[in-house]
Amino acid sequence: MISELEKKILKSLNENARKSFREVAKEVGTSTTAKYNNVKKMEKRGLLQGYVPAVDEELLGFTLTAIIAMRISQGKLYNVYDKIIKYPEVREIYDLTGEWDAILVCFFKKRRDLDNFLKTKLNLPHIERVMTHVVLNVIKDEKRAFIEAL
């Protein structure tokens, strides 16, 4: 679990990760040194894993998002994961229960790129079946940490 002070620090950073140590310390009611030490402890524990910008993929030219479900031969999940984890188009991989073994979230610039990805990069041994969904609209895409429920 996390302390109340850590929770306050995380909420503050979640609103704006570019805040200075001094700003966050003032906001959460602690000294700059205490805030710094708490952040370092959270990083060491793996609770804070980095600081990355939230980027709009469409502004980078990635206008096509595909959700790809895969059925993989029994016992071969990690053989497939070891390959697809390296593909830059694959932004997220979810290991599932149920009819499908994995879901990929992928970004592409053009339909042709998606077509090529499906026909070449996902043409792997042990991938038995693939079902692709093209995203029409993104209703919610929350990039901030899930802290509000703590």
Regions found by a protein language model. Give the residues of each.
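A compositional/biophysical signature of low hydrophobicity enriched in polar/charged and small residues
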Residues: M1-L150
